[in-house]
């Protein structure tokens, strides 16, 4: 949940008695923060420390910090953290050591602030000039995406940060941003298996403890037989992710505040 969802404030930048009472009433498992919640380093540390102290069971405190265009923390110069470039640039280097260093920078910065969950890395395979995922992806080679996303998982873990692969079962061929409306991917399951699913399958198999997988809002009618969004589809979540890929850890949806 967002802090606003349980406290009913417009923008949560402090955690005090209102947050304490909210967590007593709504014992959430985790809270996700956005740029609007994070004003500067000192404020963010206090916000997260206080929030965590009010929870009877330790919370996941998460943020979208991919590097590049999706950097809720790194995009704010007042946070005093190193800026990490986009994943496409890392993909072009084809250097696992560079990817590991980027993950260390991100993970170390988040851990120092009090976060313990990063909704990253992006495991999507960019396909075509119109791909919405763009520079957020490591590139168009499924094996490269699998390798470098797996490296980020390891480096985040080394810094005490839980990772989340996204956006299952693959956002790379989408040409409409699902923040702006319904997006349909016409691929069949065999086509997904030959490209989009490769990074997810590889990382889940080799990194059995990858803690989270985020499922997208995209529709895959040639897989599910309907326009049901992936994160509401038993065919996607249960049949493919749980059963076929044997993923047994936490599955989370993309934000339901999107269009």
Give the ranges of each region predicted by the language model.
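Active-site-adjacent structural elements in enzyme catalytic domains
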Residues: 38-60, 67, 94-114
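A short aromatic-anchored loop/beta-hairpin motif
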Residues: 21-35, 221-222
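Second-shell residues forming the walls of enzyme active-site clefts
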Residues: 7-11, 15, 39-55, 59, ...
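Short, acidic/polar
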Residues: 6-24, 98-109, 194-200
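Short acidic/polar active-site loop segments enriched in Thr and Asp
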Residues: 29, 116, 211
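A substrate-binding/cap region within the structured catalytic cores of diverse enzymes
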Residues: 85-115, 120-153, 157
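Conserved beta-strand positions in the central sheet of alpha/beta enzyme cores
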Residues: 32, 118-119, 164, 214
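Acidic helix-start/capping segments at beta-turn-to-alpha-helix junctions
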Residues: 60, 65-70, 123-129
């Amino acid at each position: 949940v967002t802090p606003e969802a349980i406290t009913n404030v417009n923008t949560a930048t402090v955690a005090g008695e209102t947050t304490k009472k909210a967590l007593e009433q709504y014992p959430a498992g985790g809270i996700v923060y956005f740029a609007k919640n994070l004003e500067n380093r000192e404020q963010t540390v206090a916000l997260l420390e206080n929030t965590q102290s009010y929870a009877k069971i330790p919370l996941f405190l998460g943020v979208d910090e991919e590097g590049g265009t999706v950097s809720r923390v790194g995009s704010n110069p007042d946070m005093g953290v190193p800026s990490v470039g986009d994943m496409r640039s890392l993909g072009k280097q084809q250097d696992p050591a560079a990817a590991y260093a980027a993950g260390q920078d991100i993970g170390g910065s988040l851990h120092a602030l009090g976060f313990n969950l990063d909704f990253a890395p992006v495991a999507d395979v960019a396909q075509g000039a119109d791909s919405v995922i763009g520079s957020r992806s490591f590139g168009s080679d499924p094996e490269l995406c699998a390798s470098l996303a797996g490296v980020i998982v390891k480096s985040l873990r080394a810094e005490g940060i839980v990772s989340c692969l996204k956006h299952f079962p693959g956002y790379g061929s989408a040409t409409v941003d699902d923040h702006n409306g319904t997006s349909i991917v016409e691929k069949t399951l065999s086509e997904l298996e030959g490209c989009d699913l490769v990074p997810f399958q590889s990382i889940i198999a080799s990194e059995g403890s990858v803690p989270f997988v985020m499922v997208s809002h995209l529709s895959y009618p040639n897989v599910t037989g309907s326009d049901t969004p992936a994160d509401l589809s038993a065919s996607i979540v249960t049949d493919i992710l749980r059963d076929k890929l044997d993923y047994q850890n936490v599955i989370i949806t993309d934000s339901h505040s999107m269009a």
